[in-house]
Amino acid sequence: MTSSTSPERADSAAPAENIHWRRNLAVCFAGSFSTIVAMTLLLPFLPLYVEELGVQGHAAIVQWSGVAYGATFFAAALVAPLWGRLGDRYGRKLMLVRASFGMAICMSLTGMVQSVWQLVLLRLLVGLAGGYASGSTILVAMQAPKARSGWALGVLSAGIMAGNLVGPLIGGALPPLIGIRATFLLAGGVIFLAFLATVFLIKEMPRPPKSATQDGKRRGGWAQIPDKRPVAAILATGMLLMFATMSIEPIITVYVGQLVEDPARVTLVSGVVMSAAALGAILSASRLGRLADRVGHWTVIVGALAVAALLLIPQAFVTAGWQLVALRFLMGLALGGLLPCVTSVIRHNVPDGVGGNVLGMSISAQYVGQVAGPLLGGFIGGHFGMPAVFLGTAVLLALGAAANGVLRARHQRRLAEA
């Protein structure tokens, strides 16, 4: 038994294994990749679109671009637990259908806005209505066999990260060819294809018996968890991971500017640095997931956090751009399987009937880290210097590894005594 598995069955009558889980995984992989590409391709030209909508002045353009981009994450963090709860009650496939259809409409309308306020409003609506990738994570986590959940979530995570990597590249190439507004319309069309694939190809397991559903209505999702301590610890770990990862993002370009002598190469090297971490994570996600299925998901979490903390220390003292690229790639390899392992630990420790609800909480916690990380990272980098961000983040990850190691050991003792 792995360290992440509860001694009790989370459900006394767990639903049978879904024979379509591999096909569902393939559709979720393709759908998550395509929707993430469509959502992130606006990054290279968002400031240009804001300027086209009438905003003038460099500071105002940067500010409105940040507001428009962050609005989606803010809204998504608010509603992720709600969609998870509704998915537990009415079906997780339905949540994917809702997300893909809503995102297709909102993304297409984004190409028709006439003011920056309309742009921000639609970006909020995308966050409220969207969540295809997070919904896919919940569906795969709940319907893949528990013994293969780490591998399946690693494959899905690789697709999501690949979408984040490819989206900005496509976004840099399309607007000069077809225009910014047409690019949004094309993105809406791509998401609509994901909607069609979801409707016709995903097969969900039957819903739980009526008595189990009624019990879920009487008791809150959190109240049904037999042992809340590992779940609470992993929720905090997911937030810590995103906080630590995103705290580096605001300073990468400025830091690279101190390492590269030619100003014309700063943007290129910064892009390579960011892509290196993503590429490493893509390559390692499914492999770390498969390893976690064998040795325990919590074990991999502790090890990956410790390795990442060690790799952050030399990043504070690099003297050339290639050194930073190499270290970020290695860090991506270490962190690639962490979020799938976080999801798997939750999956193994909550009842099937409330899994979506708790995984929705996990996604919200990660969004909080994703928003707070850049704010604190930028503040520390601006007031205490760039190396302080790397060293401070290393300390956070080391503390996270130590805390998870202690909690894992205590959890194993409780399992042995049960």
Question: PLM features: residue spans?
Answer:
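Conserved MFS/SLC helix-loop-helix module at the cytosolic interface between two early adjacent transmembrane helices
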Residues: 77-114, 292-298
